[in-house]
């Protein structure tokens, strides 16, 4: 079983997942279309405690939630070297749906930073190519603070945060090693690397998925540049994907919920409901959120 080989958390509500449509017959209780099972893919080095704050947005509304964060060494080193180790983890993650017999539930992904996007990239590939997973039904994806294109300085900032509690000598060694590897494989040997490994950002630009996407980012983000997210939004729109994007303007990397809890939660919940009712109007495209009072 995949569950025995993956460090994940699953939260299953007592009540079945239903969309928030008040029914007179039920005294205002939730009824109607089933809400999606939500899969949270955490940012590099984030703790389950931190990810649980996002999980609560969905779980308290009756959603099954799975949260998982890929090991930081795979994110920063394996992917940089072009080693697709995360593909194995992506497959185990999808196999959890069959282990818990929830593979027929609609799925919503909530993906954080480039670490989450790197894993999500392989999820997309498996959904398209793996016979067991091709019938899974994804209804939407939320991107928080990502995806970003090659930004060595931003990646170093992210890795420094991951390593902040490590001994100083080890931290310095790993930062130098990452810098050398990234520069070698993505600058000096970029044409050679491209022959056997496509960068996750480039893969997502032309992804075959067509379900709605919500991008939550900030021009104040020093890890993932706002222009990278905006370029992704334009590319997805060009592929006729229903996209909404919100610029939080002042919040730092993966800090939008912390700085604007009410507004962030409302955006996620409204997007989730629009995805499960995709036959109706889907969320419009926005480029910024000029008024944030949450």
UniProtKB/Swiss-Prot annotation:
Keywords of this protein's UniProt record, alphabetized? Membrane, Nucleus, Transmembrane, Transmembrane helix
Q: Pfam families given for it? A: DUF829 (PF05705)
Topology relative to the membrane = Single-pass membrane protein
Q: Name one GO biological process term.
A: negative regulation of BMP signaling pathway
Subcellular location, in the record's words?
Nucleus outer membrane
The yes or no answer to whether the keyword Transmembrane helix is present is yes
Q: Which InterPro entries does this UniProt record tie to the protein?
A: AB_hydrolase_fold (IPR029058), DUF829_TMEM53 (IPR008547)
Keyword Transmembrane listed? The answer is yes
Residues passing through the membrane, by range: 172-192
As for what it does, the entry says:
Ensures normal bone formation, through the negative regulation of bone morphogenetic protein (BMP) signaling in osteoblast lineage cells by blocking cytoplasm-nucleus translocation of phosphorylated SMAD1/5/9 proteins.
Family in the record: Belongs to the TMEM53 family.
Name this protein carries in UniProt: Transmembrane protein 53
Q: What organism, scientifically named, is this protein from?
A: Bos taurus (Bovine)
Q: Which gene encodes it?
A: TMEM53
